[in-house]
A protein has these predicted regions:
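Helix-turn-helix-type domain boundary/helix-start signal
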Residues: 9-12, 39, 81
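Beta-hairpin "wing" of winged helix-turn-helix
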Residues: 1-6, 10-13
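Active-site loop of classical SDR/Rossmann-like NAD(P)-dependent oxidoreductases
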Residues: 111-113
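Conserved amphipathic alpha-helical segments that form helical-bundle/coiled-coil interaction surfaces
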Residues: 18, 22, 26, 34, ...
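Mg2+-dependent prenyl diphosphate-binding active-site environment of isoprenoid biosynthetic enzymes
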Residues: 30
């Protein structure tokens, strides 16, 4: 949402360049985040992630695109929260809000399925 004085509120329309930049920053943060989580993750946290994966999978089978987009983004927030770094969690949440808008604009169902499969691979690697 973009607020413009004397004009009102508008939905932000990210450019292709902004989309690339957002995903580049996410890649850097999420790669390091996953590396740091790997040696300290608990069985309980793995179970929590597996439950989230089941919810993602269910969301892919219905037509609620916004809901599935939110769940796919939430996966990364769950990982960040597990590290206990509130600054990282907040920064990632802000990036995910931007990338979710991009996903709503451009992500196909096939691409969403591939994202969910990547999440499964991440949890498998963490386990």
């Amino acid at each position: 949402m973009v607020l413009e004085p004397s004009r009102g509120a508008f939905v932000a329309m990210p450019s292709v360049e902004e989309a690339r930049e957002v995903f580049e920053v996410r890649r850097v943060l999420e790669t390091d985040m996953t590396r740091k989580l790997c040696p300290v993750i608990t069985d309980h946290q793995i179970a929590e992630l597996r439950a989230h994966l089941r919810t993602e999978k269910e969301a892919l089978s219905n037509t609620n695109v916004a809901g599935r987009t939110q769940l796919l983004a939430d996966f990364h927030v769950v990982l960040a929260t597990m590290l206990g770094n509130s600054v990282l969690t907040k920064m990632l949440s802000e990036l995910l809000a931007r990338s979710s808008l991009i996903a709503l604009m451009y992500q196909s169902t096939l691409s969403a399925i591939e994202s969910q499969e990547e999440h499964v691979a991440i949890v498998d690697a963490l386990e």
